[in-house]
Regions:
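Conserved alpha/beta cores of soluble small-molecule-handling proteins
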Residues: 4-142, 146-149, 172, 185-253
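Glycine- and Gly-Pro-enriched alpha-helical subdomains that act as flexible
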Residues: 141-142, 149-171, 177
């Protein structure tokens, strides 16, 4: 299991929610009782401080510990924790100003699997998806689920804007419910933007006025082209800009 987050001036945005999600994942795997959440929080900040970082990218990984090679979890009750903090490097400014391209790929999410909602180091599907999108000349991959509905991107959640309303695939679509996704859903009503979690079809994506993706590292990026076709007017839209500004104000980024 792992969490990935960014710190702003030494403060990790919604670290408590990242750790709560980590705890839920640990419970799913039967190792939650051995998890010291308050100790992990202290360790994250100690790692940031030791590396003398203010704006940082953090990866916290927890395993069930050391054991014999098998399909059974170690029973020692002693978890292994690895924390990596490095300088936060965001995509180039033009990616935010002009948007990026995406392609719908064959690599898929499984909405029936409980693993879809668990943040882990199992990135093989995402690696395949990103490779397929690169082959198509795009920077990001849009992944469908086994029902042919839009799920998420390779390492990010996806939103569409249609007639001024905001939509994002529901958790039941086979997504990892991101902390930034959660923040956007909370911010939208305060901006007068109606937001809904629902099934999103490929046609909805193609007909959208705007599309944006989110995660804790990139924050919010506009998608302006899908499978070689412009999305909306082919440039970042006003709803995306308003949400991005509100998110930066929230994080202090």
């Amino acid at each position: 299991m792992c969490i990935r987050d960014s710190s702003y001036d030494g403060q990790v945005f919604r670290l408590d929610r990242h750790l709560s999600r980590l705890a839920r994942s640990a419970d799913m795997l039967g190792i939650g009782t051995a998890l010291d959440i308050s100790g992990l929080e202290r360790a994250v900040y100690d790692t940031i401080s030791a590396n003398e970082l203010s704006d940082a990218r953090i990866r916290l990984t927890v395993t069930a510990g050391v054991g014999e090679r098998s399909l059974s979890l170690p029973t020692s009750g002693s978890l292994t924790v690895i924390i990596v903090a490095e300088e936060l490097v965001l995509p180039l400014p033009q990616a935010y100003e002009n948007g990026i391209r995406a392609a719908i790929v064959g690599a898929a999410r499984n909405s029936r699997s409980p693993m879809s909602a668990l943040k882990s180091l199992g990135y093989l599907e995402s690696l395949m998806a990103r490779s397929q999108s690169a082959d198509a000349g795009a920077e990001e991959a849009v992944m469908l689920n086994e029902r042919g509905l839009v799920a998420e991107c390779s390492t990010s959640n996806i939103f569409i804007v249609a007639s001024g309303r905001l939509f994002t695939p529901s958790v039941e679509s086979g997504i990892l419910p991101g902390i930034t996704r959660e923040a956007v859903l909370e911010l939208a009503p305060g901006l007068g933007i109606e937001a809904s979690e629902c099934d999103v079809a490929v046609a909805d994506l193609l007909d959208a006025d705007e599309v944006l993706i989110t995660n804790s590292v990139i924050e919010m990026l506009p998608l302006v082209e899908l499978d070689g076709r412009p999305i909306g007017r082919g440039k970042p839209g006003e709803v995306t800009k308003r949400l991005s500004a509100a998110y930066k104000e929230l994080t202090g980024g």
